[in-house]
Amino acid sequence: MDKDEFSRQARDATQSLYRVACAYLASPPDRDDAVQEALLRAWEKRRTLREEQYFKTWLTRILIRV
């Protein structure tokens, strides 16, 4: 997955990530930090994603583990 494709898919998933973060974290700054950390980890591990069609699911799992 190249930089542009990652950026596009991450942008498309951002609203969903914030909804998940709201379910796990009460503090808005903590939510922001968790989403940002998940995006950073996803970028660093992007080569481990086996099928791009599951990007959003994969990214959500990363967020939950942050």
For each feature predicted by the language model, list its residue ranges:
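Short alpha-helix-to-loop micro-motif enriched in aromatics/charged/Gly
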Residues: 47-51
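Structural recognition of an alpha-helix C-terminal capping motif at a helix-to-coil junction
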Residues: 19, 33-40, 53-65
